[in-house]
Amino acid sequence: MHEVRAGLETVALNQAMDKATEEQIRDLHHHLEEMFEAAKDGDEKFFMESDIKFHETIVDMADTTDLKKFWNMCNIRLWTAVCTKRSEKELQALAEFHVPVYEALVNKDSEHAYKTMREHFHNVSQYK
């Protein structure tokens, strides 16, 4: 599932670079800040919701109906919950894995985006 989701979100990230509005970029940053806030508070549930919103915002930025359908078929809520609960990483580290993804989008660096998204999913899939 990691590879499928990584592929979908890499495509979404690259498309989002050309289509994202300033409001969507602010929303994405807000979700990133929420992840750090949840990590600081040790609030795993809020962290997972913010994580899902972060990734969903990227998919929405791509503005592709079929991509969103496939993404929804991946059962993101369950997948995020399993990965978060089983991860050997602290919530703070999981939040930090999202920063390069955000930066790649803001900087419109498609080459870095591909590498960043692959690394992101590799990092979050490391289990106890």
Protein language model features and the residues they cover:
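C-terminal all-alpha effector/ligand-binding and dimerization domain
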Residues: T10, H29-F36, D41, K53, ...
